[in-house]
Structure formats: structure tokens, C-alpha cells
Curated annotation (Swiss-Prot):
Enzyme class: ligase
Protein name: Folylpolyglutamate synthase
Natural source organism: Saccharomyces cerevisiae (strain FostersO)
Cofactor stoichiometry and binding remark: A monovalent cation.
Gene: MET7
Catalytic reaction list: (6S)-5,6,7,8-tetrahydrofolyl-(gamma-L-Glu)(n) + L-glutamate + ATP = (6S)-5,6,7,8-tetrahydrofolyl-(gamma-L-Glu)(n+1) + ADP + phosphate + H(+)
């Protein structure tokens, strides 16, 4: 293979992934104390450092430029691939107790301590369903107070079309130029510093934090450099050991509806999941949660709040919001909007912008600016309606049981009286896809029957390539190429639907879109769901068509 500059990113990606595989499969790395007592192991990694330096791949990206595309390529090299994820799962160890210690160390290496992040006046939000929507609502409300809060940061995940969506200021993704600038400032600081291998055996020279951890560090750096006056942070997974939990003094914490998800990492009961979510609670920072939480989960959340010496308050749905058209559709969003009202109220009161906090009562009076903020909230891929040509697309990236029921119910109620043809476009590559389809089917039936059902992969283009921002290494490439999940979904659908709908399989989202355009001369209602990756890929395909 010719090793030119263009091959460096691929070279370093391959090297790091194989190195990670060694680490993940080596028992001693799960136990730092064994590292200290094993001279051979330590010598091995000193030698690896030597190879890093000798091969000049410690930071080859300095040699190929620092554009946005370079940043995305480098960022994608930090993803855990499917084999590594499976290796971790096989160990049965859910907890990486080093996560937060490592986050503190990574932060030190880029020039910050956790206390530096306190100046961001953070709202910290966790939950299973609706935490992204709640974060968006909260950010939009705060954005109505521009004179007092000229810059509001928003950190969410995952993204739909562009990784820049994860780091927003005043509701807008940061520019490609700023993303690249701040990305390489963090990247280069990590390259120019080292950590003690006695304390942090995983942090060998040349290594970087994983994809989400790196973005979390990048968000802190960006928001501080941009002088954001308040920031809204959505937890990645769980709370207790999430990399965002390096936040020491949030102003307020929120918990959206709990459900069963990410069971490998969080546990497979509501109690275990609630315990993890409650890990973001901090002394002195009041916590709020939506009403109608599962009773067992609510009990644990209350215990966690008491543990952390703070208060937990259930937020009712405000009556004043009953007739408000929220910027994010779906009746279930009313509870998320109500939670956002209380979170924003705490920030604004603490900042001496609101004289009095909003009362946590269903009859409370909500300021007009709050209402405008809720109405103006924009959040693609969640109960989104798009008219494209003759067809109407109903798009929601639901990928858990509860969110699938909510999204399917929204679609059913919205198109119940429509006489158009009905088409389903679905994929879920890493969870129990058939179970989600069953949830969908039972939620729309018998009122809605689909004429055509299309199961696709999350591959963006019919050439077999992905949009660079949508590259994902955490699914089995073999399963994608052989359409294993999609063929299984067809069998399951035909069984539950008694072969009424015509089923199709496509190898890419672009092909699925082309198929839909040719199915009928008459208009159709198209429900797209199952995966945020699917939704993001479809929106990217739409963008290219619109440009043409």
C-alpha cells in the first residue's frame, strides 16, 4: 500500500483500533493495579510508544490540513468498532469506573479543571425518552432573553445530518470553520501532553478519548471560548458514569420519562436505570422530573436526590400549555415542555433575570417569553412533517419501545382521516428491531394499514458509501452488506400483517427514497422511523435533491 498523506487518517484509524482491541481483550487493563506490577506489560507499551513516534502517525493530521472534513475524519477514527463493542459486552462488565477520572485527566490536558465549567451555568438533563427535546425547549426559552444571556450553549446527541448539530450556540450548529478550529485546538493539546501510565493505563501516548468523550471535551472548550452565559447539557447514556457528569455544579438538573434502554450499560430494570440517571444529581442543584414516572423509578430517583443532598420535584403538565402549538409536535411533548419551563425558570432566577421562580403547579402563570420560546423550538427528526412533491413525510427517529409507541400514535392520530396511500420506511440496526416493529404495528392497528413497507439499511448512498458525518462503526458490517436485519424484518412483518402489505428491502436510503417516488402516481403518507441514523441519512438525501 502506498503510504501517502491521504492514507494517514486510515492508517491511524486502523492502528488505533487494533491497539484498542489488544487493550480491551487484555484482562490486566481492567485492573490498573496489575499494570503497576507487570513490568513486561509496561515495557510493551513503552515499545508501542516508540513505534508511534517512529511511524510518524502520532499526529499525521497536522500534515494533511485542518479543515472541517479533516476534523470529521479524525473524529470518526475515535469510534469504537463493532468487534470492540462485542468484546466489551462479552466481559459482562457494565461499568467503566475510570470514565470520570479519565475525563478529569483529559480536561487537565487541554487546559481545564472541572471547576472551570461551573461558569457555564449548566442545565443538566437525563432520562430515557424526550431528553433531547427537553434540552431544545430549555435552550429556546433561554434564547428569548438575549439581552441578559447573549449566548446560550446546547450540547446534545446524537446528530442527524452533521456532527456540528451536537454543539449549538443560540440554537444553531457552530460553523464548519469554528468546529475545525476548536476541534484541532483540543486535538493538538492532547497530542502535546501525556498522562501517568501508572494512574491511567489506557491513556498511552498518542491515544485520544473516545468519540463521545472527545465531543464532550470539545463542547466545554467551545462554550468557554465563545463566552456562553448558560449551557444546556444532555447526558449521553445514563448519568452516573456519563462523560458529561464531570459537571460538578450545575444550576439545575432534569429527568425526563424513564424507560428500558441501553440495558447493557445501565441495567435491565427501571430501578437500575433510575439509579444511573439519578447520578447527575448534585448538592445545591434542585432536580425536577416529569409526572407519571414509573413508580419504582421515581422511588429510586427520590432516594438518589436525598443521597446527593438535593430536592426532587415532580412537574405537572401546565394547563396554560394545553392550547399552545409547540415547536416540536406530539401530545407527549407537553410534559417535556413543562419540565423545560421549570429548568429555564431556575436558570433565569439564579441569574437575577426572573424576580420570582415559576410555581411548580399546573395552574402556574407562564411568562410570554417562555411561550414564544416553546413555540419557536426547532428539532428535526422528532415528529417532523415534510411535504416533498406529491408526498407527505412523517419523520421520527424513535428507537425505544416507549418512543416508538409515542411516535406511532402521533402518526396514527395525524393521518387517521387521510385517504392517501400509506408507506412505512423503517430500520434499526443495533437494537431488537423486530420488537420495535411489533410495538409500531400494535400502536397503529387497526386504524392504519400500510400499503407498502420498506426495510432499508442506514447506508446513505446507493454507491454503498455514507455521508462523512454519518459514518458509524458500531454495527456489524457483514450484517449490513448481507441485509440480515432487513430480511428478518420482512419475515416478521409478513407474519404479523398476514402478508397484506407489499414488503421491500433496499441496500441504501437513497434507493429507498427512489423506490418510494416510483411506487404510486398518487400522493402518499410516508412514516419514517426506527433510527435517528435512518432519519439523518434521509434528510441528507433530501438536501442533495433540493440542491439539484
Amino acid at each position: 500500500m502506498h503510504i501517502g498523506k491521504k492514507n494517514y487518517p486510515n492508517l491511524i484509524t486502523s492502528f488505533r483500533m487494533n491497539l484498542k482491541k489488544i487493550i480491551l481483550n487484555h484482562d490486566r487493563f481492567s485492573h490498573p493495579e496489575r499494570w503497576k506490577t507487570n513490568a513486561l506489560l509496561r515495557f510493551t507499551f513503552v515499545y508501542i510508544k516508540f513505534l508511534f513516534d517512529l511511524m510518524i502517525i502520532k499526529n499525521p493530521l497536522r500534515m494533511v490540513g485542518k479543515t472541517y472534513r479533516d476534523a470529521v475524519t479524525a473524529l470518526n477514527s475515535l469510534q469504537s468498532n463493532y468487534a470492540n463493542i462485542m468484546a466489551i459486552r462479552q466481559t459482562g462488565d457494565r461499568k467503566n469506573t475510570m470514565t470520570l477520572l479519565e475525563m478529569h485527566e483529559w480536561s487537565r490536558r487541554i487546559g481545564y479543571s472541572a471547576s472551570d465549567f461551573n461558569k457555564l451555568n449548566i442545565v443538566h438533563i437525563t432520562g430515557t425518552k424526550g431528553k433531547g427535546s427537553t434540552a431544545a425547549f430549555t435552550s429556546s426559552i433561554l434564547g428569548q432573553y438575549k439581552e441578559q444571556l447573549p449566548r446560550i450553549g446546547l450540547y446534545t446527541s446524537p446528530h442527524l445530518k452533521s456532527v456540528r448539530e451536537r454543539i449549538r450556540i443560540n440554537g444553531e450548529p457552530i460553523s464548519e470553520e469554528k468546529f475545525a478550529k476548536y476541534f484541532f485546538e483540543v486535538w493538538d493539546r492532547l497530542d502535546s501532553t501525556t498522562s501517568s501510565l501508572d494512574k491511567f493505563p489506557h491513556m498511552i501516548p498518542g491515544s485520544k478519548p473516545g468519540y463521545f468523550k472527545f465531543l464532550t471535551l470539545l463542547s466545554f472548550h467551545t462554550f468557554i471560548q465563545e463566552d456562553c452565559k448558560s449551557c444546556v447539557y444532555e447526558v449521553g447514556v445514563g448519568g452516573e458514569l456519563d462523560s458529561t457528569n464531570i459537571i460538578e455544579k450545575p444550576i439545575v438538573c432534569g429527568v425526563t420519562l424513564l424507560g428500558i434502554d441501553h440495558t447493557f450499560m445501565l441495567g435491565d430494570t427501571i430501578e437500575e436505570i433510575a439509579w444511573n440517571k439519578g447520578g447527575i444529581f448534585k448538592s445545591g442543584a434542585p432536580a425536577f422530573t416529569v409526572e407519571k414516572q414509573p413508580p419504582q423509578g421515581l422511588t429510586i430517583l427520590k432516594e438518589r436526590a436525598e443521597e446527593r443532598k438535593t430536592t426532587l420535584t415532580e412537574v405537572p403538565s401546565f394547563k396554560q400549555l394545553e392550547n399552545v402549538k409547540l415547536g416540536i409536535a406530539g401530545e407527549f411533548q407537553k410534559s417535556n415542555a413543562s419540565l423545560a419551563v421549570m429548568l429555564a425558570s431556575e436558570i433565569l432566577h439564579t441569574s437575577n433575570i426572573l424576580e420570582e421562580k415559576i410555581k411548580c403547579s399546573s395552574n402556574a402563570s407562564i411568562p410570554e417569553k417562555f411561550i414564544i420560546g416553546l413555540q419557536n423550538t426547532k428539532w428535526e427528526g422528532r415528529c417532523q412533517v415534510l411535504e416533498k412533491g406529491k408526498n407527505v413525510w412523517y419523520i421520527d427517529g424513535a428507537h425505544t419501545k416507549d418512543s416508538m409507541v409515542a411516535a406511532s400514535t402521533w402518526f396514527r392520530d395525524t393521518v387517521r382521516l387521510s385517504k392517501r396511500k400509506k408507506i412505512l420506511l423503517f430500520n434499526q440496526q443495533s437494537r431488537d428491531a423486530n420488537a420495535l416493529v411489533n410495538n409500531l404495528y400494535s400502536s397503529v392497528s387497526p386504524e392504519i394499514t400500510f400499503d407498502d413497507v420498506i426495510f432499508t439499511t442506514n447506508v446513505t448512498w446507493k454507491s454503498g458509501s455514507y455521508s462523512a458525518d454519518l459514518v458509524s462503526m458500531n454495527t456489524s458490517q457483514e450484517d449490513v452488506e448481507k441485509l440480515k436485519v432487513q430480511e428478518s424484518l420482512v419475515k416478521n412483518w409478513n407474519k404479523i400483517d398476514d402478508n397484506r402489505a407489499k414488503t421491500h428491502v433496499t441496500a441504501s436510503i437513497e434507493e429507498a427514497n427512489e423506490l418510494i417516488e416510483t411506487l404510486y402516481d398518487e400522493p402518499a403518507d410516508i412514516f419514517v422511523t426506527g433510527s435517528l441514523h435512518l432519519v439523518g441519512g434521509l434528510l441528507v438525501v433530501f438536501d442533495r435533491i433540493d440542491v439539484k
